[in-house]
């Protein structure tokens, strides 16, 4: 588990020999900054750039043109200090790290997840909320995020409604989830379409993801809510 490896302070960073994870944590009051089960790392530490460079080289060799960057908020967390003494705030650290990201991945389509809304000029798209899967509650969650976050497609090129997952869901749930993605502006298929993937899921995908008239609606623009002043959220 990547979280368990990353949260072992004495573990050497495999990709960057000579550094241990404890060397790159962001500390507040002497303790590692933790959020959502993972420790934040210092974007100004040399090992952070080295890992970006190494990963970028791998992705470019493999021919990838798209990269999803997750848990970006960790890079904006406040700390007692940063490796680079010129950095004094979390957002300064985030900007520093994002400039490196642009340096190594700037020729790719970058999709940010769990990230600050601003600064926004380092990526083409940003996930409009957190994880949304395949059930009706996930559709409700996405629509709630769209109701109050539609304007972000004026900040980024695209709002990302999270991957559309069809497996283990009813036809009605599939249709609703596809709709929630289409009206957000784009959607990304999230099931396993490899040779070993589920035949049922592939059939569902052919049924729900190949409707030309529906797909034409997903043109990168988010729908605007008729009423944006509601007082209740999903499931209420």
What annotation goes with each model-predicted range?
Residues 77-91:
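Active-site cleft segment of glycoside hydrolase catalytic domains centered on the general acid/base Glu
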Residues 52-81:
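Active-site groove signature of glycoside hydrolases
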Residues 73, 187-188, 211:
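Short hydrophobic/aromatic residue motifs in ordered secondary structure
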Residues 11-50, 54, 92-199:
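Glycan-recognition surfaces
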Residues 8-15, 79-83, 122-124, 203-205:
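Short secondary-structure transition/capping segments
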Residues 2-3:
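Short, small-residue-biased leader/transition segments that mark boundaries at the very start
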Residues 195-236:
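Non-catalytic C-terminal accessory modules of carbohydrate-active enzymes
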Residues 7-8, 73-74, 117:
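Conserved beta-strand edge residues that scaffold enzyme active sites
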């Amino acid at each position: 588990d990547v979280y368990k490896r990353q949260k072992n302070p004495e573990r050497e960073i495999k990709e960057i020999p000579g550094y241990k994870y404890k060397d790159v944590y962001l500390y507040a009051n002497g303790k590692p900054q933790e959020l959502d089960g993972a420790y934040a790392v210092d974007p100004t530490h040399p090992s952070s750039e080295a890992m970006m460079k190494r990963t970028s080289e791998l992705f470019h060799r493999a021919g990838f043109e798209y990269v999803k960057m997750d848990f970006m908020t960790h890079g904006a967390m406040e700390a007692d200090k940063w490796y680079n003494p010129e950095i004094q705030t979390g957002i300064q650290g985030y900007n520093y790290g994002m400039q490196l990201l642009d340096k190594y991945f700037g020729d790719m389509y970058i999709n940010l997840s769990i990230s600050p809304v601003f600064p926004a000029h380092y990526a083409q798209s940003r996930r409009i909320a957190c994880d949304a899967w395949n059930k009706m509650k996930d559709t409700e969650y996405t629509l709630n995020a769209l109701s109050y976050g539609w304007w972000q497609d004026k900040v980024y090129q695209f709002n990302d409604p999270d991957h559309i997952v069809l497996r283990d869901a009813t036809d009605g749930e599939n249709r609703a989830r596809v709709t929630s993605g289409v009206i957000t502006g784009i959607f990304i298929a999230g099931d396993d379409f490899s040779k070993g993937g589920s035949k049922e899921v592939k059939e569902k995908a052919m049924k729900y993801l190949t409707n030309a008239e529906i797909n034409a609606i997903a043109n990168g623009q988010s729908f605007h809510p008729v009423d944006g002043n509601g007082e209740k959220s999903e499931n209420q």
